[in-house]
Amino acid sequence: MIYWVRSYPNGIKPMRTTIKLFLPIIIALSITFTSTAQPSGSFISEEAQESCVKYGEEYGICPELLMAMIEKESSGRPDVESGGCKGLMQISGRWHKDRMERLGVTDIYSVDGNIHVGADYLSELFEKYCDVGIALMVYHGEKNATTKAELSDYADWILTRSAELERMNGK
């Protein structure tokens, strides 16, 4: 029941009236946002999350690490382009043309194709450097990544976010 009062003492509305008026709106919004939330706690699309799981399994990479990279590289937007790098994982067609051909990826803006190329490259870096921090810094194109004594802010952010996503997924 909503209370309609034309005048209030000291101009202050009774709290119960305000709550009763806004409660249906609050409930509707909470249902809307709860139902659209991603299961991993990430804001990237379900399609991208599925590709992260698929290529994570194929290459032995934690899917949450790939998701964290996507969040950092493109904010989960497959249409992003920056400095010649494109898509979710910011792949450079110039540097990864052969890799794309080998993997059969023709559209770098394709969610699945972009993640496939990024995971393949990251896997190669893991094999070469045997260190996830160094691999992330090289992926990011950081100079002297192999001789740095500490992780870069980029690598640290990716690892921290990956751990958060893993906890959200019960790992």
Model-assigned labels for residue ranges:
Residues 13-23:
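Bacterial N-terminal signal peptides that target proteins for export
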Residues 22-32:
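Bacterial N-terminal signal peptides
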Residues 34-36:
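Membrane-interface motif at the C-terminal end of an N-terminal transmembrane signal
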Residues 38-171:
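Catalytic glycan-binding domains that act on GlcNAc-containing polysaccharides
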